[in-house]
Curated annotation (Swiss-Prot):
Its EC number is 5.3.1.1. GO terms for molecular function: triose-phosphate isomerase activity. It comes from Caldanaerobacter subterraneus subsp. tengcongensis (strain DSM 15242 / JCM 11007 / NBRC 100824 / MB4). This is Triosephosphate isomerase. NCBIfam families: tim. It catalyses: D-glyceraldehyde 3-phosphate = dihydroxyacetone phosphate. The gene is tpiA.
Length: 248
């Protein structure tokens, strides 16, 4: 059985002091969670959040990383830095990174391979835009992104990768895919992983849904056979709301 994973991507929200307050409120609310719980604050909050969640069931994630260990890459953060402060997961290829910072499938793949080589678990985001959806290209776009992201990932490492299906048109818009629609796309992602790594490995890979996930719609998504959790945005900024999602 795949253990569900609920991750809260805070995006560019919460100063270090606000971050501490949020996780302190969250800890008692999720202590009995059956799902794996991950918080993903901005870089400047990571050290403080790591300190507060130490010894709890909450794991730490980062929102991005560069693929080199060190060097003249102004403004970037390396996997070595993340590992040292206690990061377990790293989000790679979020649609906002692809859109605003022009991340390509090739860059996403470099980051995935680098994360795995430094014992970080990638949460790889894939998803189609509204125009791509309307043109009937959902599967083409999402499965291509999946294949490109996983190039060179070993059979041994594939089960450490989490995929997050985030339809771009559903992020922060209040619109969301129906649980059935999301499940169909996620099933296709799993079938693609099976083509690359075999059915047994594909059955072990966790695939999340992301895109306007809230306390009142989480149970519908989690009832679907192939959805293994959620990558939560705005609702993860309020402890009570995120806890309701975690404890669906």
């Amino acid at each position: 059985m795949r253990r569900p994973i609920i991750a809260g991507n805070w995006k560019m929200h919460k100063t270090p002091s606000e971050a501490v307050k949020l996780v302190e409120e969250l800890i008692p609310l999720v202590k009995d969670a059956k799902a794996e719980v991950v918080v993903i604050p901005p870089f400047v909050d990571l050290t403080e959040v790591a300190r507060v969640i130490k010894g709890t069931n909450i794991l730490l994630g980062a929102q991005n990383m560069f693929w080199e260990e060190k060097g003249a890459y102004t403004g970037e953060i390396s996997p070595v830095m993340l590992k040292e402060i206690g990061v377990t997961y790293v989000v790679i290829g979020h649609s906002e990174r692809r859109q605003y910072f022009k991340e390509t499938d090739e860059m996403v793949n470099k980051k995935v391979l680098s994360a795995l080589s430094h014992d970080l678990k990638p949460i790889v985001c894939v998803g189609e835009s509204l125009s791509q959806r309307e043109e009937g290209k959902t599967y083409d776009v999402v499965l291509t992104q999946t294949r490109e992201a996983l190039k060179g990932v070993s059979e041994e490492d594939i089960t450490k990768v989490v995929i997050a299906y985030e339809p771009v048109w559903a992020i922060g818009t209040g619109k969301n895919a129906t649980p059935q629609d999301a499940n169909e796309v996620i099933k296709a992602i799993r079938n693609t992983i099976a083509e690359l790594y075999g059915k047994d490995k594909a059955e072990m890979v966790r695939i999340q849904y992301g895109g306007s996930v809230k306390p009142d719609n989480i149970s519908g998504f989690m009832a679907e056979s192939d959805i293994d959790g959620a990558l939560v945005g705005g609702a993860s900024l309020v402890a009570e709301d995120f806890a309701k999602i975690v404890n669906y």
